[in-house]
Regions:
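Conserved hydrophobic/aromatic beta-strand scaffold that supports enzyme active sites
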Residues: 31, 242, 314-316, 326, ...
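Asparagine-centered polar/low-complexity signal
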Residues: 190, 312, 398-401
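Alpha-helix C-cap/termination motif
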Residues: 57, 123-124, 199, 257-260, ...
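CN hydrolase (nitrilase-like) catalytic-core segments centered on the catalytic cysteine
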Residues: 133-134, 152, 263, 271, ...
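Soluble catalytic regions of membrane-associated enzymes that act on cell-envelope
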Residues: 222-336, 364-367, 373, 377-379, ...
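Active-site catalytic loop in hydrolytic enzyme cores
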Residues: 81-102, 131, 135, 141-179, ...
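Membrane-embedded alpha-helical bundles of multi-pass enzymes
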Residues: 3-231, 235, 406-407, 418, ...
């Protein structure tokens, strides 16, 4: 009798221990799901041949070894993708180092989760393992879609709708609600499945032990989602103000409102004067930068070398360095991705003033950030993204004037191309347009903030840039489809399909 009791206690202790391990592993798996798109679903399917290979051989060392090997391969896949995000020109970006530190968590969490699945298959049989793996796959899918980091093909319309929200409210709610709710559901499912499949009598406090493991997951999720925003606020990036108007129109308003920002941006052609003929531009920019106590970027025009051509230029003035610098437009339309109906582009008129291509530059603004500047249609060329990323900017800025494109469809296509550049470079893009959409596009290609009403009275767009960068492989927007293939930080190929529906 005593031996049977001891055996029963041993079995119950084993079951309760598994409950806690499964709860913690499931919660950690859900928390880490979605960092790299699609790998969660791929991994849940890939472990089936390994289970079949060790079926009927309850060697726990073999089980743990297979689980560790599989988790190592899975983590290496994540590592390759993360390294591709952060490793450029022989060094890691500062943002990627934090992501690389999560590899240890991936190894521990997924080793425990996969080993528990092996244990379920060998000891409990395939129905219990199937139920557990189904809940795991479901949790990965829900977490990927809710956190907007996976492919999310079935949730594509939801992602497009929520990408228009101001300030990324949906992402913040999903971080808290999605991770917490899915962890709760997975843990409860684990406990119910084990209770239904258990062949030995369980003690009365078995479910209480399962609740303890579930509370650990909930506390972990709550702590992470509460501490993370506070930590990011202490390490937030620069504050940028986009002023979609002519130079001088809102200067009095900016000075009276006493806006505290690191950078003020005016669109292409905002300054009516021309450099090389009137040097008052530098003086006016210096006075404004001193009053606002911030860096300034303003679009203007200047004559090229030898007074032969007209350059579209961005002027930059920093009150810290007291330096005035210029960045010229690199490319001229026709736009590379767009194809006209007849298959040929019109010739550029006015050959008396030929276009002189310039070079884009990166500038350091207040707060220690480096920004890369593109003018007009520069961002529609893939070569611009590749050349500007060689200078390691942390933020991309595009100033434009879309008065030349009265068609709303053309403006949508331009906006879709800017989203493509954000995905390809994995950098946020601030777009300040004289006419058109002034917006903030994050590294996933989602429009976080926008101001469509460009007509007077002009509305300022104030953006607080996040410190971290996110990325994606797939993005669709409206009538356009963009696909970027990357490996090791190098763009291997890209595809853009832009429809030409007539406006109704």
């Amino acid at each position: 009798m005593n031996e049977e009791r001891m055996q029963g206690r041993t079995v119950s202790l084993e079951h309760n221990l598994y409950r806690i391990i499964a709860s913690v592993a499931s919660g950690a798996g859900v928390w880490s799901a979605g960092t790299i798109p699609g790998t969660g679903c791929l991994a849940c399917v890939a472990f089936i041949p390994l289970i079949l290979a060790i079926r009927g051989a309850p060697n726990y060392r073999l089980v743990l070894s297979c689980g560790a090997a599989f988790s190592l391969c899975w983590s290496l896949l994540k590592l390759e993708c993360i390294a591709g995000m952060g490793f450029r020109n022989g060094r890691f970006d500062s943002h990627a180092i934090g992501w690389l530190s999560l590899i240890v968590l991936f190894l521990v969490a997924h080793t425990a989760a996969v080993a528990s699945l092996y244990y379920l298959w060998i000891v409990r049989g395939w129905p219990c393992c199937l139920a557990h793996s189904t809940t795991w796959i479901a949790s990965e899918l829900i977490a990927d879609g809710s956190m907007q980091r996976g492919f999310g093909l079935s949730l594509d319309s939801l992602r497009l709708a929520t990408s228009q929200l101001d300030g990324g409210v949906f992402t913040q709610c999903a971080d808290l609600g999605g991770s917490l709710l899915v962890s709760w559901l997975v843990t409860i499912t684990n406990g119910l499945v084990l209770d239904l499949r258990c062949r030995e009598p369980l003690p009365t406090n078995a479910f209480a032990l399962c609740i303890r493991g579930m509370c650990f997951v909930i506390a972990f999720s709550l702590t992470y989602n509460v501490v993370r925003p506070v930590f990011l606020k202490t390490l937030k990036g620069p504050t940028v103000v986009l002023v979609p108007s002519k130079w001088g129109v809102l200067l009095s308003e900016l000075t009276t409102r006493e806006l505290r920002a690191d950078l003020f941006i005016w669109p292409e052609g905002a300054h009516a004067e021309t450099l090389n003929t009137d040097m008052r531009i530098e003086t006016s920019l210096a006075e404004c930068a001193t009053v606002l106590d911030a860096s300034i970027i303003v679009g203007c025009k200047r004559l090229g070398d030898g007074q032969r051509g007209l350059l579209n230029t961005a002027c930059h003035y920093s009150p810290d360095t007291m330096k005035f610098d210029l960045s010229d437009k690199q490319f001229l339309a026709p736009i590379s991705e767009f194809v006209p109906p007849l298959g040929q582009w019109f010739k550029i008129p006015d050959p008396a003033t030929p276009y002189v291509p310039g070079k884009s530059r990166c500038w350091a603004i207040q707060g220690g950030w480096r920004v890369g500047v593109g003018i007009c249609n520069d961002a529609t060329f893939a070569a611009w993204g590749m050349s500007i990323m060689e200078k390691q900017p942390e933020l991309l800025i595009v100033i434009s004037n879309e008065s030349f494109s009265p068609s709303n469809q053309m403006r949508k296509q331009l906006l879709a191309t800017y989203q493509l550049r954000a995905i390809g470079t994995r950098r946020s893009i601030l777009r300040c347009a004289m006419e058109g959409t002034t917006c903030l596009i994050d590294g996933r290609g989602c429009i976080v903030k926008q101001n469509r009403d460009w007509r007077p009275p002009t509305t300022l767009l104030i953006c607080e840039m996040p410190l971290t960068q996110s990325w994606s492989l797939y993005q669709s927007c409206g009538d356009s489809l963009s696909l970027v293939i990357t490996c090791g930080g190098v763009i291997l190929g890209e595809y853009v399909r832009l429809t030409s529906r007539r406006n109704r």
